[in-house]
Amino acid sequence: LAVHLSMILSLRVGEILGLQPGDIDFDAADGRGTITVGRSLQRTEKAALEKTDPNQIYHIFPDQREGSSSALVLKKPKTKKSSRTLYLTRPLKEELLAWLEKLRQDELAMDGRYRNCGQLFRLPNGMPVAPEALSKWYRTWRAEHPEFEKIVFHGLRHSSATYQLIESGGNIKAVQGNTG
C-alpha cells in the first residue's frame, strides 16, 4: 500500500506515515474518494526538537527504543503546498478499504494489548511505523524481486511525477500541485 501511495499519489515517506484513517473520504468526488495530506511523520533528534517551533508539532510518540536520542514526531508537512487533497483511483480505494479492515483485525487479535497510535500505517501492536522501518521493508522486498528496476523508495515519487508529467502533456503546474 505504501508503494502504491507513493507511485500513484506521489507521496513522500513522511507523508505516507503521517496519514490517518480520517484523512480518507471514500464518498468524496462523487464516490471516487479522496485522501488529504496534512501531516508528516519523521524521526527527529531530541536535541533538534527543543529548537523546533511547537506550532509545527502535532504529537511526539512515546519512545520505543530505550536510550534513543531521537523520537517519532508527527508534524506539519514539509511546505504549505505539501498540504493537499488528492483523488483516489478505484484500485487504491479498494486497497485502502482492505487495509482498514486489516487494522481492525490486528486490533482484535491483540486482545486488549493493542496501542492504537491513530496512524494509517501501524505495527501489528498498533504503534506507528518509523520511516526507517518502511525504507528497510522496501529494500528487503526489492532484494526479493530482482525483476523490478532497482530504485530507492523516494524514487517512486520521482517516477510518479515523471509519469504525471507525460500524462498531462507537460503541464508542470498540475504536477506541482499533485506532488506538493
Where are these regions (language model features)?
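Conserved tyrosine-mediated DNA breakage-rejoining catalytic core shared by Y-recombinases
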Residues: 19-101
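Flexible loop/turn segments at secondary-structure boundaries
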Residues: 12-13, 44-45, 95, 128-129, ...
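Basic, Lys/Arg- and aromatic-enriched nucleic-acid-binding interface segment
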Residues: 1-13, 17-19, 29-32, 81-83, ...
